[in-house]
Amino acid sequence: MTAIALTIAGSDSSGGAGVEADLKTFSALGVYGAVVTTALTAQNTRGVFGIHDVPADFVAAQINAVFTDLDVGAVKIGMLANASTIDVVAAALDRYRPRNVVLDPVMIASSGERLLREDAIGRL
């Protein structure tokens, strides 16, 4: 049986980070990857030009869709963007109790732009 991992993170339009990079890693390791997208970013190797947060209720809907259908063995958490999303993800982890969780919160892009709202830092 193929192992299943879920990435909960932002989407990087250049493919160098976020869910796109996580899926590449999962695939290279022979793991089936599922995705919950928390934010859409307009970025490239030079910088971040825009961030659109996915509404927290839609993040919750994505998480529920994955966990009610797939046997997720591991969850990797990246960009959460805001306090509402952090709360939704925390509640889902408490509800579904995945066996393995990696918390790798992305707070600042490699180009220096803030990816986590300052008022959400304490929620982590």
Regions found by a protein language model. Give the residues of each.
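Small-residue (G/A/S/T)-rich helix-start motifs and N-terminal tracts that mark the onset
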Residues: 1-74
